[in-house]
Amino acid sequence: MKEAKHLGVDMFLLDDGWFANKYPRQNDKAGLGDWEVTHDKLPNGIPHLVQVAKDAGVKFGIWIEPEMVNPKSELFEKHPDWAIHLPNRETYYYRNQLVLDLSNPKVQDHVFG
């Protein structure tokens, strides 16, 4: 990151793919909703990256999409009822994902808690 700082980079953004262990995020088919660091990809965790960025004088940001879930995720396995389902309609998967029902207090606690 020090080299990036010298090039004028002022923020490091950790994008999609840093999360999920049972179903690691390798593509858009799995892992969304399991917001735990993938140990294989980041063995030192996110705090290490934050410190490296700080030491280099670069801000740190991280991508999340807390309102979405992949059917192939631990979250969906445990709580399939948390995804929005419309009665008498076929389930629609946009990019292999579903929208969590943020009107559900349990979902709110999970996302914002």
Label the model's feature ranges.
Residues 1-113:
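Aromatic-lined carbohydrate-binding/catalytic grooves of carbohydrate-active enzymes
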